[in-house]
């Protein structure tokens, strides 16, 4: 029975943590703003959602692979400390409001799915949620579950935005969301550091 419980925990912890971190971190993020712009321009939610899904899977798989192998190559206390500190830095970054770049407000011509796929993939590079994915993969030493969780988190945040537009960002004040995201990043960072020094 204990083995079954431990097995479920191994699966659920990286999956649920990754989903929660990215779902909250994505609200008000640049990629969510992009999803709103695409929805307003094309008014075709299905190909936009599919484009977001595919772009996120590609982008976050790459990010998870990077985190996974970085954890393999850079083992030991210094690396774990670096991961913990990185999460604390992410907590500070999460408090900074995102804005849509002016050059992304004008989306180029092309098929809706392909346009969404390309623009979303490019905008996600170096974004908070991509970096969070890399750190989560390093923390849990998982590729599949972390990628599945972060992709699900992106969809949880972006699908309502595609259907509801900017109204979705007003359901809960963005300041509250940013504080919640910062709190989650800070807790994970503290957890990693405490675990590294065997304080928990």
Sequence positions of predicted segments:
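Juxtamembrane boundary at the C-terminal end of a transmembrane helix
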Residues: 191-200
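Membrane helix-loop-helix hairpins that form the core translocation module of multi-pass transporters
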Residues: 43-112, 160-171, 176-183, 190
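Alpha-helical transmembrane segments of multi-pass membrane proteins
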Residues: 21-25, 55-56, 86-94, 119-123, ...
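Selected transmembrane alpha-helices and immediately adjacent juxtamembrane segments
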Residues: 101, 105-130, 136
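Hydrophobic transmembrane-helix microenvironments that flank and shape a buried ionizable site
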Residues: 23-29, 56-57, 77, 81, ...
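Juxtamembrane transmembrane-helix termini in multi-pass membrane transport proteins
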Residues: 5-75, 132-153, 160
